[in-house]
């Protein structure tokens, strides 16, 4: 993600579209993420209505989730930093293979 290119609301909308295109839009009921700084949950909020521009150095979570009542729930969480011309930087390092818990 590049400095000043998108708002928090834009990023949320992009993620919602991907989840909707995958057939799970109605089950994505939470905001996409939030800022991390002096507090663990702070602005900007990656959600509808937050029109703040994301600028270089901002740190936030990206945590899309799908919860289908009585069936399943899934959430991933990454921490990212908005970059300059080079784009953003992913700070989270963990395995990406799917783990099914029955």
Residue ranges and their predicted role:
Residues 1-102:
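Active-site neighborhoods and metal-handling regions in enzymes and metal-associated proteins
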């Amino acid at each position: 993600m590049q400095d000043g290119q998108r708002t928090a609301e834009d990023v949320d909308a992009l993620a919602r579209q991907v989840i909707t295109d995958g057939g799970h839009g109605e089950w994505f009921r939470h905001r996409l993420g939030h800022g991390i700084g002096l507090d663990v949950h702070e602005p900007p909020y990656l959600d509808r209505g937050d029109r703040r521009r994301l600028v270089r150095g901002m740190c936030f979570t990206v945590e899309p989730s799908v919860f289908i009542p009585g069936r399943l729930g899934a959430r991933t969480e990454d921490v990212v930093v908005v970059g300059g011309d080079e784009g953003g930087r992913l700070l989270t390092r963990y395995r990406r293979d799917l783990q099914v818990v029955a």
